[in-house]
Each structure stands twice: as structure tokens, then as C-alpha cells.
């Protein structure tokens, strides 16, 4: 039972074209437990364009597995749900799905994509947070 969280660590970073005006960016903060192939945490999707999708917080769970894809050593998948509010003149809210997938190296840099209500972002960079890069080195 004590080995359940063996090797657990924190991973932080972004998925998306950071610096591109109007591009949606998914910022992640995840607890990774490689021995259990599990990932749990939070993703915050931001977009400079104002509207109901300009700031979304999503609790996520997922899987992490070793990969043998050249420079990419790990495959990660995330899923979660968040409350999406319908803009006026309609009234209401519903649970919307969030999904992400990426192929990364040991420093959490690579390529991936994510989708959320009526948005699909593919083939974008995955970058570890600057302070995480030095911790993993």
C-alpha cells in the first residue's frame, strides 16, 4: 500500500501556440503517478477573445504511458468536464467535455492537442513550465 504513490511528481506547462494572438491556450498542473499510469489535476483554458470560452477551469484525470516514438518518451491523455454557460439571449448551462492528448519527452516538451465545446486544437506545442524544466533536468 505504501508503494501506491511511488515516484509521484508535479508537472506544469502549456498546450497551444503561446504568443499567437487569440489562440486558445491550455495551462496544466498535474500530479503524475507513473507506477499507476495515472494523471490528475487541473487545466485552465484561456483565450484573449472575450466570451464564455475565454477562461475555463477543468478538473481532469488521465493516463500516462511510456512510448517508443523517437524523441517522444511518454504519451498522455486527459479528460474532464466543466460547466459551460450559454450566452444571451439563450439561458442555461450544461456540462461540456474536455479532452487532451500529447506526446512528450522526459522534460514534458512535445506536441499535442485538446478539444472543448465546439473547439478543436491540434498539432500544437506542449511546453513545460520554465521552473519545471530545471527541476526535471
Specify the residue positions occupied by each region the protein language model found:
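N-terminal glycine/threonine-rich, aromatic-flanked beta-hairpin/loop signature
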Residues: 32-57
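A short, structured loop/turn motif at beta-sheet edges
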Residues: 31-38, 65-72, 104-106
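Mid-chain, well-packed structural core segment of small domains
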Residues: 61-101
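Short, solvent-exposed aromatic-acidic interface loops
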Residues: 43-49, 79-85, 115-121
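Amphipathic hydrophobic-ligand
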Residues: 22-26, 53-61, 92-96
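Short, cysteine-centered beta-strand-loop-beta hairpins and adjacent loop/turn segments enriched
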Residues: 18-22, 47-54, 85-89
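Short, solvent-exposed loop/hinge segments that bridge or flank secondary-structure elements
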Residues: 2-36, 54
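Edge beta-strand at a domain terminus
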Residues: 53-65, 109-137
